[in-house]
């Protein structure tokens, strides 16, 4: 089962996305800020991290840089998520170490397609 670390401080949105990911066959771990994301990435060793970029304590940009610079966590793929649509954010995400970037509100099937592409999976089975 593919392990996903979902990092978002929006409790309702996080819960909804988490439930949908579980129904698609993912194991989901949740963190609510950048510091928790780094700790969870070290502890849980997820294959993919869905990282909101606007977070308390430590933002997603900085957390992604830390995760990608740590030997213990750099193998995890990161998809940056943001409600912001500012010019240059996609490039900023790439510079931070994100493997892809998506805009909120999340279009679930598109997000799963990005996950499958990044992980090289042909299809994630529904449980």
Where are these regions (language model features)?
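Charged docking surfaces used in two-component/phosphorelay signaling
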Residues: 15-23
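Residue-level signal for the "D+5" position in two-component response regulator receiver
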Residues: 30, 55-58, 87
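C-terminal output helix
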Residues: 94, 106-115
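Short hydrophobic/Thr-rich beta-strand motif most characteristic of the beta2 strand and flanking loop
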Residues: 25-32, 40
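Active-site beta3 strand of CheY-like receiver
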Residues: 44-50, 55
């Amino acid at each position: 089962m593919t392990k996903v670390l979902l990092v978002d401080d929006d409790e309702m949105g996080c819960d909804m996305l988490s439930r949908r990911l579980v129904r698609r066959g993912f194991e989901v771990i949740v963190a609510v800020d950048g510091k928790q994301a780094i700790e969870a990435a070290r502890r849980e060793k997820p294959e993919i991290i869905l990282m909101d970029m606007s977070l308390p304590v430590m933002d997603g940009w900085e957390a992604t840089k830390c995760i990608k610079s740590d030997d213990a966590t750099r193998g995890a793929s990161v998809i940056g998520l943001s409600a912001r649509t500012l010019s240059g954010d996609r490039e900023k995400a790439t510079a931070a170490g994100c493997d892809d970037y998506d805009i909120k509100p999340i279009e679930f099937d598109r997000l799963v397609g990005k996950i499958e592409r990044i992980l090289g999976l042909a299809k994630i089975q529904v449980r």
